[in-house]
Amino acid sequence: MSLPHATIPTNLRRRAFRRSCDRCHAQKLKCTGSNANLVRAQCQRCQQAGLRCVYSERLPKRNLHKEAAAGTTRATETSQPMTATSSTVFSSLAETPPPYCSPPTHIGTSALKETLSEPSAATLQFYDTSINFDDPESFPGGWPQPNTFRDDANSNESSGIPDLGYDFEGPLDATAPVSPSLFDLEVEGNSSSGQSNTSNTQRDLFESLSDVSQDLEVILHGVTVEWPKQKILSYPIGDFLNAFGRLLLHLQERVITSSNSSMLDGCLQTKNLFMAVHCYMLSVKIMTSLSQLLLSEVMKAQPCGQKQSTRMDWYWSGSTTRNDNGRAEALPSFHSNLHIGELISHLDPFMHALSSACTTLRVSLRLLSEIETALGIAQEHGAAASIRLVLSDMPSTSWQILGAENKTITPASRLLSVLWSDEAGDEEPKSTKASGKTINVLRRCYKEIFALAKKHNIA
């Protein structure tokens, strides 16, 4: 007779035990017992302590994804009755107003006094017993009104709070006062905030002028050292003109100074005047060196050979020159990569150099004239005015730099008269270098270049 086979369920969970005993697991120590699946011997620590090793069953691993999904489902199911409950509560609140929605009770009513507990003896020393909360007349200044959100001017003065003058109930006035020109004086209030703003503006202006001064110094070094080593017509002129434009922009900035300004404001204004005049002198020296290079380039481009003269005659006359045999002379050759803008320089280098020099000097002269106007230099005292007198064939004696003792000239002109005293005295320059008679050299270069332009009908 055979026994029936035992049915083994298929869903039995496999029991797993820890690899370390309970004592080693609790102390976070490495267990030295046996790692056999069925028989686990005692570890050395348990043997030395005379204890029995116990290996507990390992807890099953948790499935976090399933638990999170189950938690979301429970939260969804729970929120539905809560939503219904909350809607019921809010509807009941809308029907029956709460007690705190009723009109507020006066602070001096007997109900409030009954609510307050009787103060202790230690607290009574901080109370003013002369104030009766039932009598508004006993409160100093009367009861404060419930809709009072701002004090009047009298209360501000009495409390020591300055009235800033801002009225948020009316429209804001965004118009700013018109400022005078640079280095002028305007009467303003003597408030400390106004003086501080003026000082900060003067410092910002000095930093801007210092940056322009550094750029002009770099350009002056390039004109006197780097540019003579190469063709002047191929050198970029944009940096020079942009520096002139920035100087003009900073000189046109408005700085308000007060008649009661501090000594510091006066010192800052004088420092800005010196820096502005320094930038102006750098500009004049750059124009002097540049005009010398342009005049030298024009002189080099003058026709001196038969080949160049024939090419210029062919371009300007419109007829072809023929030799004794009646054959036409060789036409000028053109490079395959010749650009349209380079065609005039290829056919007539002299006219190209002369027209380029005239254009550069005209633009520089106009910027220099506007800088003199913004700086406050009178036309009869500036270098630009002297150049115009030369170009108009007027006697040079009509232009002169007045002495410092003349009180009618501006501060910038008075300062220039001192700084130019050793560079603009004689009519003829003692040296052709930029360090010599700067203005006289500048006037001579302008006169010679525009005389050639007038001769060739391009002035």
From Swiss-Prot:
Question: What's this chain's function?
Answer: Transcription factor that regulates the gene cluster that mediates the biosynthesis of compactin, also known as mevastatin or ML-236B, and which acts as a potent competitive inhibitor of HMG-CoA reductase. Binds to the consensus-binding motif 5'-WCGG-N(6)-TCGG-3' of target genes.
Can you say what this protein is called?
A: Transcription factor mlcR
| Taxonomy of the source species | Eukaryota, Fungi, Dikarya, Ascomycota, Pezizomycotina
Q: Does the keyword Transmembrane helix apply?
A: no
Alphabetized GO MF terms: DNA binding; DNA-binding transcription factor activity, RNA polymerase II-specific; zinc ion binding
Identify the domain of life. Answer: Eukaryota
Cellular component GO terms, alphabetical: nucleus
By its UniProt entry, which InterPro entries does this protein fall under?
Carb_Metab_Trans_Reg, Zn2-C6_fun-type_DNA-bd_sf, Zn2Cys6_DnaBD
Task: State the compartments where it is located.
Answer: Nucleus
